């Protein structure tokens, strides 16, 4: 037959109130302490170190990213400045070459005009000289004709 005790459980059941219960409680506390000191603390320390490592790496990455962005902005600024300076130099060189071209063209035109004027004056002198010779020859010829006509009479 089954005998029931005051709490409704049979003897030798799952929960007997005797020395086993405090012993089990002491074992649970001891096991918790041992697991905590041998397993959970080292694992917790490793996890904390890993979190610190990851956190530090993230902070370093953010700092490096901001530094890279700053350097990129500086380099872009320098690039724009260099492009502006290059355009300015090219523009100045074009202006200088245009100026030199115009000066050379003006000098060539002046030389051409001077040569043309010199040639015109030389042609006028030669024409005048040729005209004078023709007039002199015409005078000589007319004098010769007049002298022959006078001699024939």
UniProtKB/Swiss-Prot annotation:
Keywords linked to the UniProt accession: ATP synthesis, CF(0), Hydrogen ion transport, Ion transport, Membrane, Thylakoid, Transmembrane, Transmembrane helix, Transport
InterPro entries: ATP_synth_b (IPR034679), ATP_synth_B-like_membr_sf (IPR028987), ATP_synth_b/b'su_bac/chlpt (IPR002146), ATP_synthase_B_chain (IPR050059)
Membrane topology, from the record: Single-pass membrane protein
Domain of life: Bacteria
Annotated compartments: Cellular thylakoid membrane
Pfam families (alphabetical): ATP-synt_B
GO MF, one example: proton-transporting ATP synthase activity, rotational mechanism
This protein's GO CC annotations: plasma membrane-derived thylakoid membrane; proton-transporting ATP synthase complex
Principal location class: membrane
Residue intervals passing through the bilayer: 23-40
Family indicated by similarity: Belongs to the ATPase B chain family.
Function: F(1)F(0) ATP synthase produces ATP from ADP in the presence of a proton or sodium gradient. F-type ATPases consist of two structural domains, F(1) containing the extramembraneous catalytic core and F(0) containing the membrane proton channel, linked together by a central stalk and a peripheral stalk. During catalysis, ATP synthesis in the catalytic domain of F(1) is coupled via a rotary mechanism of the central stalk subunits to proton translocation. Component of the F(0) channel, it forms part of the peripheral stalk, linking F(1) to F(0). The b'-subunit is a diverged and duplicated form of b found in plants and photosynthetic bacteria.
NCBIfam families the record matches: PRK07353.1
Assembly with partners or alone: F-type ATPases have 2 components, F(1) - the catalytic core - and F(0) - the membrane proton channel. F(1) has five subunits: alpha(3), beta(3), gamma(1), delta(1), epsilon(1). F(0) has four main subunits: a(1), b(1), b'(1) and c(10-14). The alpha and beta chains form an alternating ring which encloses part of the gamma chain. F(1) is attached to F(0) by a central stalk formed by the gamma and epsilon chains, while a peripheral stalk is formed by the delta, b and b' chains.
Protein name (database record): ATP synthase subunit b'
